[in-house]
From Swiss-Prot:
Origin species: Angiopteris evecta (Mule's foot fern)
Cellular location(s): Plastid, Chloroplast
Keyword Chloroplast included in the entry's annotation: yes
Identification of the protein by name: Small ribosomal subunit protein uS12cz/uS12cy
CDD domains (alphabetical): Ribosomal_S12 (cd03368)
Keyword Iron: no
GO cellular component, one term: chloroplast
Family: Belongs to the universal ribosomal protein uS12 family.
Gene3D superfamilies: Nucleic acid-binding proteins
Assembly with partners or alone: Part of the 30S ribosomal subunit.
Any one of the GO BP annotations: translation
GO molecular function, one term: structural constituent of ribosome
Amino acid sequence: MSTIQQLIRNTRQPIEDRTKSPALRGCPQRRGVCTRVYTTTPKKPNSALRKVARVRLTSGFEITAYIPGIGHNLQEHSVVLVRGGRVKDLPGVRYHIVRGTLDAVGVKDRKQGRSQYGVKKPK
């Protein structure tokens, strides 16, 4: 415990809360260019080939972002929009690519939960 004299000398510092998506620099989304598009395997009880991309953001960061949905058209030099949001079973993946914007097309034949995948309402 601090003495009153110590508290007069220098006050208590508030605890700074760290952001979960530092590469976005406080913005809701950031634009970036894919440098590598590949698949990776998830952590222990799960098994799959998850689609991810290495993205160089306009903020200067190089991050790993998850590509949601079934099938995608992304390749090297594709321009994408990145939002926050981690993938629990992929260590180090703290960002999602926004489908239906810039070079990332929406998910084909998706009928339900379309908003997250950039799909217009079917006629």
